[in-house]
Amino acid sequence: MSLFSIIKDCGGIHNIQRVLIPDSRIIIEIHEFELLSAEAKQQAYNLTLKQVTYQQTVIENKDEFGAQLLEIGQLISDQQRQDITPYTAPVECEFRPDWHISPPQGLLNDPNGFIYHQGQYHLFYQWYPYTCVHKDKYWAHLTSKDLVNWQWQPVALTPSDWFDSYGVFSGHAISQDDLLMLFYTGNVRIGEQRDRHTTQCLATSTDGIHFTKQGPVVPELPPGVTPHCRDPKVIRHNDRWLMLLGVQREDEIGRLAIYHSEDLKTWTFIALCGDELGDFGYMWECPDFFTLNQQDFIVIGPQGIRSPDKSHTAPHHNGIVKAQLETSGKALLSDFQPLDYGFDFYAPQSLETPDGRRIMCAWMGLPDEIDHPSADNGWVHQLTTMRELSYDNGALIQKPIKELATLRHTPIVLSKDETSFDLHSKAFELQVSMQWGSVLRLHQSESGYCEIRLDSASRRLYIDRSNTLIREGDTVREMSLAESDSVQLHIFSDTSSLEVFINEGEAVMSARVFTDKNSTQLSFDGDVQIQACWLLNKASAPFIS
């Protein structure tokens, strides 16, 4: 019996939710039982999962069977694209950002495939379009000429195939001449116990818009690793390709798995790396790799480590380690430091611009925090602003990209004799110098505000959003600063977010800040000098036109 005959017996392609092929079985998940043929109804059926199982299926021609699977996956994808069309139109919401990337509807999380290819920037992100939950992820696709104004493109990848039908999970991109290659993790769940199966997959495009799935290129797990194995980052190093994967060892310790390849299609395992960091979290997610000023760095998201900030209770962290790549491809890691000391920064990705700058953006959210006020309007989360990374005198420096200056409206002149101002907007850029013991309040009205304060005794900077509309997650973040007479802050504000660059980029703190639409005032106590202020224009909306 051919696979197409099975699909026909199961009610046709429009009745198919997904196809799974564990072991020698073929499992067809359907929408309506009544559409099954009499023969299909004789097969084992799981009422809870709505799955028909064909046992002990003999596959005589594996190449033909594989081609049929990809063809059926494409048909399912075509249907999925039709189904999500109403969800590509943005819903109105008072918390919608003016110049950050947010989803039209549904849930956004990790940025993916951030790359410069054929004269423009490409940025994808994890997206579940239907509701604000983590489920069956798609890859939304945006393009830009300037890293500020983004245009919606057709969804790049949908969860349509036997190897990714429970989610086209995160990954990176490679630009090879005219070919744009997307490496990602295919996520599959089997049975009522939801056994996880993960493979590392490839999709390619010759026009940068329409992608063809090639299937798994790393079909097996690394030795000694659980199915928590994901988020491929592919780099060119020593004249060969390396793939970095975030993994969990079988003893529930997070590590980095490294593979090598000559052709980007056949991959060989090298090693698990990171033992020198010890017991450093139960899982590492979303690796990235780049070189700054001749120093190699690897970004990891270690889950379950202890934060030096006692007010940081979430298990999810992001940071950067120095990396020493050996000729074999194995990496030695050292000197972990956070990339962001705020509330909302996870799963960052970076690219190199044509003029040689390293630019990074991240998900401005965390995996366990979904109940934001915007969810009442059917969407949740946004990406951070783009930041430029450099490495000078042994210090990582992060600054807002220069292109953001194009958003500046007429400068706002604030009186030195006043301590409270109404900007009549939440979208602004602010440069201030604060003395120890001073307090700055932003997004302020009678109903609430977000506060930045410098504690003289502890020499710590605090961001406090406890007087906002936040529903879940921590409300205070803090960090120690070096001895100085004053602290320089470069603040970028949008409708429901703040990003604070500290002391010329020595540290950054990012926060989602939800306040009512009238919360457009700023005020301060103590010695605060406002050096510059601009209202920011809207960027082009990153939605379908």
UniProtKB/Swiss-Prot annotation:
Keyword annotations of the record: Cytoplasm, Glycosidase, Hydrolase
Cellular component terms (Gene Ontology): cytoplasm
Gene3D superfamilies xref list: Exo-inulinase, domain 1, Glycosyl hydrolase domain, family 43
Endpoints of the signal sequence: none
Enzyme's top EC category: hydrolase
A GO term for molecular function: beta-fructofuranosidase activity
Enzyme Commission number(s) from the entry: 3.2.1.26
Keyword Cytoplasm assigned: yes
Positions of the catalytic residues: D110
Domain of life of the organism encoding this protein: Bacteria
Pfam families: Glyco_hydro_32C, Glyco_hydro_32N
Pathways involved: Glycan biosynthesis; sucrose metabolism
Chain sites annotated for binding substrate: L107, L108, N109, D110, Q126, F169, S170, R230, D231, E285
InterPro entries documented for this protein: ConA-like_dom_sf, GH32_Enzymes, Glyco_hydro_32, Glyco_hydro_32_AS, Glyco_hydro_32_C, Glyco_hydro_32_N, Glyco_hydro_beta-prop_sf, Suc6P_hydrolase
GO biological process: sucrose metabolic process
Catalytic activity: Hydrolysis of terminal non-reducing beta-D-fructofuranoside residues in beta-D-fructofuranosides
Subcellular locations according to the entry: Cytoplasm
NCBIfam families membership: scrB_fam
Family per similarity comment: Belongs to the glycosyl hydrolase 32 family.
Function: Enables the bacterium to metabolize sucrose as a sole carbon source.
Protein name: Probable sucrose-6-phosphate hydrolase
Native source species: Psychromonas ingrahamii (strain DSM 17664 / CCUG 51855 / 37)
